[in-house]
């Protein structure tokens, strides 16, 4: 697992029983797992009175480092023994390693499921409806006779989450849009050939 120096320092800070006593340690671990599952927020970290004795900067660094550690180990699906070995390398006591291992056992499935649906996708166009309208006249001009296309795009953001994009365009604007889309397609094809 490739972890940055900051993350490794944060994990080593968890091993310092003088800086982080057992009650603070348990609170940090509990909060980390529940923040990932969105059952708690980061501000809940400071709700415990025992945390007030710990340096705020060290607490925040340790908290963020352990969140990264959890996410990275879940992302590559590290097994319990690998997690224990890594924590042991960074000087955590066996009781603390066991405590963390129990949380991994308890929340592994839920976190992996949560990570599988936690991603960002641009909306995909799944349907297009259009209608041709004709503006006959306006307040300023007696006769206009301009064709206008009313376009409705149905998009899909995530699983079964649909949205709508509606706009009106003249023939020139529509041709310009088609030209720009074709240009973008060519650029993507060129970049995929290069790589």
From Swiss-Prot:
One of its GO terms (biological process) is sodium ion transport. It comes from the Eukaryota. Residues 124-192 form the COMM domain. It holds the Pfam family COMM_domain. Component of the commander complex consisting of the CCC subcomplex and the retriever subcomplex. Component of the CCC subcomplex. Scaffold protein in the commander complex that is essential for endosomal recycling of transmembrane cargos; the commander complex is composed of the CCC subcomplex and the retriever subcomplex. Belongs to the COMM domain-containing protein 3 family. This is COMM domain-containing protein 3.
């Amino acid at each position: 697992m490739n972890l940055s120096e900051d993350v490794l320092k944060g994990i080593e800070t968890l091993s310092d029983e003088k800086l982080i006593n057992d009650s603070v340690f348990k609170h940090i671990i509990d909060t980390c797992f529940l923040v990932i599952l969105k059952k708690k927020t980061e501000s809940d970290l400071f709700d415990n009175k025992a945390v007030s004795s710990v340096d705020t900067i060290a607490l925040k660094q340790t908290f963020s480092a352990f969140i990264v550690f959890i996410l990275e180990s879940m992302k590559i699906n590290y097994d319990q023994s690998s997690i224990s070995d890594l924590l042991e390398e960074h000087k955590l006591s066996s009781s603390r390693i066991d405590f963390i291992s129990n949380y991994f056992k308890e929340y592994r499935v839920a976190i992996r499921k949560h990570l599988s649906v936690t991603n960002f996708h641009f909306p995909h166009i799944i349907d297009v409806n259009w209608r041709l309208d004709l503006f006959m006249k306006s307040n300023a001009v007696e006769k206009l006779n301009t064709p206008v296309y009313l376009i409705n795009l149905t998009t899909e953001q995530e699983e079964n989450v649909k949205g709508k994009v509606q706009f009106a365009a003249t023939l020139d604007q529509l041709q310009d849009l088609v030209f720009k889309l074709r240009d973008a397609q060519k650029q993507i094809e060129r970049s995929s050939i290069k790589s």
